[in-house]
Design a protein with these regions (language model features):
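N-terminal, polar/charged subdomain of small-to-medium soluble alpha/beta proteins
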Residues: 1-90
């Protein structure tokens, strides 16, 4: 059985884009993250160690948005996905 964790509307200013003004002025980015996982162990134990920490996922995503600039949004999204996929249980 697979369950889903969805974080929506994570907001931060980033300096991503192909154009100079995007890197210079920055812009607001809104990130949604969907993770497929299995909640059964966490449901039985009521222990954060048995699930994915939503706050950690949000911090990872926002760190990418506010971090070094990417030209393409696709590259930013791939970096966020790569970070999330390193978490146990994903």
């Amino acid at each position: 059985m697979r369950d889903r964790i969805t974080l929506t509307g994570l907001r931060a200013t980033g300096f991503h884009g192909v154009f100079d003004f995007e890197k210079r002025e920055g812009q607001q980015f809104v990130v949604d993250v969907m993770i497929h996982t299995d909640h059964r162990a966490a449901g039985r134990s009521d222990d954060l160690a048995d699930t994915i920490n939503y706050a950690e996922v949000a911090e990872m995503a926002l760190a990418r948005v506010t971090g070094p600039a990417y030209d393409l949004i696709e590259a930013l999204a791939e970096a966020i996905a790569g970070d999330v996929l390193t978490l146990a249980g994903v």
